[in-house]
Structures are given as structure tokens and as C-alpha cells.
């Protein structure tokens, strides 16, 4: 009689996998195991791995877990292609040690070799192969971690695969009924505090909330305003204007200005709203002053420089003080153009 405890880790894992697959084939003979995209289906075989670490599961626990998992798979029968092929995809993932890659997984040779293998054994086109890749990676990494991996993936020759995986994940979220707030949390967009606009996962969230009835930039502004006041949102916009999401930042600034305009907020009210009136002699170096300038120009009612001069007088800043402010601001990388133009206006040039 064979004593299971005396089997080597490798033989134990192989024996369990063989028993599980044979069991599945026995109970699913003639069953239709065709396409679908349910993430839960493949989560089950995560414990079929035959690595040394897996050998330390309690023997009874492992056997019954495998059997139950395959029963569930047989019941659902929603795999992209047959389970034996899906298991081959998973096995090759482990053999190539894709999960051992610590950075830039999608640009690694391990992932490339694995993706080529999946495409080769899948005879039904690119999409089923991508679904099999998604199922396997989601089973190994978890949905949340995979979402962040896709969001931070660098541009490579495998961009098409990454794009398809993102599409599959978005569909998976919608089918499982995840809300915009759920996806916001999955992508950990608030993990960096006020650094949301620099988060590489932001485009994925915007894509998720976008619909014929939903303006995604408006949705973003509403989301940010739930947590921050307008001056903080303005600072966030400014700090992300040269980052990975600079296009989104520009759109968000326009949306913020539109919101002010719809609420009939005047130029000087926005000046106070952004707390520029508290800046004192550092006003010309304040990074969000530019946002105020853009709003004044959008309103097309006043000259922002004339409004500034009027404010300087009310604030008790004399010509000498203003001259020092201009000289200092001209050295500023962001607002030098405001200082230069103001100087020219005051000198009559």
C-alpha cells in the first residue's frame, strides 16, 4: 500500500493533478465546455499548481479542494475552450515561471513565450486565447493586482494583448455588477491621497464610467469634489500637468471652469475660492494663478492683469513691493510669463 505522506512533493503534485483531470473528464463526458468570460471559473484551479510550496497543503484538504473545484467547473461549463487546454495554459504559465517576473511582466520574454504558446494551442482566434491568458493571470494574481499590473504596463510589442486584457477585465467588472466606486477602490486611485491625477490606473477608471449618458470627465470632477474642495482640486490639476495623465488634467481644468461658470461664479469670487487672496506677496508665484487666468479669459468680460493691479492696490502693495514680486516671479518656471506681461503692462510697453 502506498503511503501518501512518503511521496515526494513533485510526485504528489503530479498524482493529484492526474486524479483531478481524470475525475473531471469522467463527470463531463459529452459536456459542452465552450466560451465565456467568468473569472470565477478559473479561480478554482489555482490550487492545482505542482510547485514545491503546494506540497505542504494538508493532503485531505488538497484532494477535496481539487475535486470540488473541478465539480464547480463542470457545473458552470463556461470556459473559453476545453478544461484540459486551459490546464495546459496554466501549466505552461508555471513552467515558464511567469509569476516570478517582478517588474514589467508584459514586456518580459517569459510572458511573450507563454502568450505565443497560448495562441498556438488555441485554434479559434485571438480573443479566446486572450481570455485564457486573462483567466490564468487573474487566478494567479487576483483581479485587483492584475488590474494594477495592466494599468502600469509599459508600451511594448505586446500592446495588443494588454489592450485586449484590459477590455476583458472591463467586461468582467460590468458583468459582476461592480460600481464606479468599486473599480476606483480596486485600482487604488485614492491610495496616494491627492495624487489621483498622476495614478496610471486613472484612464482605466474613466473608461469604465464612460457611457452614452455619462461624461467621464464630469464624473471624475464629481468624484474628486466628494473628497476635496476646489482649491485642492486645482492644485491636483497643476501638479499633474506634465505627468502621465496630462491630457486628462487639461480636460479636468476645463470641466472645473465650466462648473464655476454654470454656477455664475465671478472672476474675483473664483480668486477667493482658490484662496489667491491669501497669497500676499507670493501671489505671482502661486501655481494655481494660471488656472484663474484661464477662467478670466474664458469669461471674456475682464482683463486679468487689470484685475490683478486692482487687487494689489487693495492689498496695500506699493510699486516697490510689486516690483520685487515681479522680479522674483520672472525666475519661476511656471508663472514667468505672467510676471513678464504684467511688467510690460505697468511700464506702458
Swiss-Prot record:
The keyword Secreted applies. It comes from Phytophthora infestans (strain T30-4) (Potato late blight agent). This is RxLR effector protein CRE15. GO terms for biological process: symbiont-mediated suppression of host apoptosis; symbiont-mediated suppression of host MAPK cascade. It is found in: Secreted; Host cell membrane. Induction: Expression is up-regulated during the biotrophic phase of infection on host plants. The gene is CRE15. GO terms for cellular component: extracellular region; host cell plasma membrane; membrane. The RxLR-dEER motif acts to carry the protein into the host cell cytoplasm through binding to cell surface phosphatidylinositol-3-phosphate.
